[in-house]
Amino acid sequence: MAKPIPKIGSRRNGRISSRKSARKIPKGVIHVQASFNNTIVTVTDVRGRVVSWASAGTCGFRGTKRGTPFAAQTAAGNAIRTVVEQGMQRAEVMIKGPGLGRDAALRAIRRSGILLSFVRDVTPMPHNGCRPPKKRRV
């Protein structure tokens, strides 16, 4: 009979206090992923560990409203509000995707008071890789 493998750590008893409030982050990276259907804003520290995130869907927007610039602005504001309280002053911004929320999210980040060291477009561009899907006929 095989021995049961003991659990090393479970999620329930792992954390006693909130880790997010304990960390002080002076510098971070803000990732904005803007698709036509949604905008996701993730704030990480310089090592890549996620500190805060928000999307248009988590901000209460549903359906086609998630792809709007206003939804992206709200998502960026919600994600950044928590890290400003933790003491973030400088950030780099990585924008990915062709969505409508790119500029609106960047505008909300600029208004938050965080100094931006650079803004980089990291949208993946194929060097003629995969064949695209066929054109829609409506």
Curated annotation (Swiss-Prot):
Q: Name one GO biological process term.
A: translation
- Region Disordered, residue ranges: 1-24
InterPro entries this protein is in? Ribosomal_uS11, Ribosomal_uS11_bac-type, Ribosomal_uS11_CS, Ribosomal_uS11_sf
Q: Which PROSITE patterns match?
A: RIBOSOMAL_S11
Keyword list (alphabetical) reads: Chloroplast, Plastid, Ribonucleoprotein, Ribosomal protein, RNA-binding, rRNA-binding
Any one Gene Ontology molecular-function term assigned to this protein's record? structural constituent of ribosome
Biased composition, class Basic residues, residue ranges? 9-24
Domain of life, per UniProt, equals Eukaryota
Gene Ontology CC entries for this record: chloroplast; ribonucleoprotein complex; ribosome
Q: What is its main location?
A: plastid
Q: Where in the cell is it found?
A: Plastid, Chloroplast
| Gene3D superfamilies, per database record | Ribosomal protein S11 (3.30.420.80)
A Pfam family: Ribosomal_S11
Recorded family membership: Belongs to the universal ribosomal protein uS11 family.
Q: Could you describe the subunit structure of this protein?
A: Component of the chloroplast small ribosomal subunit (SSU). Mature 70S chloroplast ribosomes of higher plants consist of a small (30S) and a large (50S) subunit. The 30S small subunit contains 1 molecule of ribosomal RNA (16S rRNA) and 24 different proteins. The 50S large subunit contains 3 rRNA molecules (23S, 5S and 4.5S rRNA) and 33 different proteins. uS11c interacts with bS21c.
Function summary: Component of the chloroplast ribosome (chloro-ribosome), a dedicated translation machinery responsible for the synthesis of chloroplast genome-encoded proteins, including proteins of the transcription and translation machinery and components of the photosynthetic apparatus.
Protein name (Swiss-Prot/TrEMBL): Small ribosomal subunit protein uS11c
Q: Which gene encodes it?
A: rps11
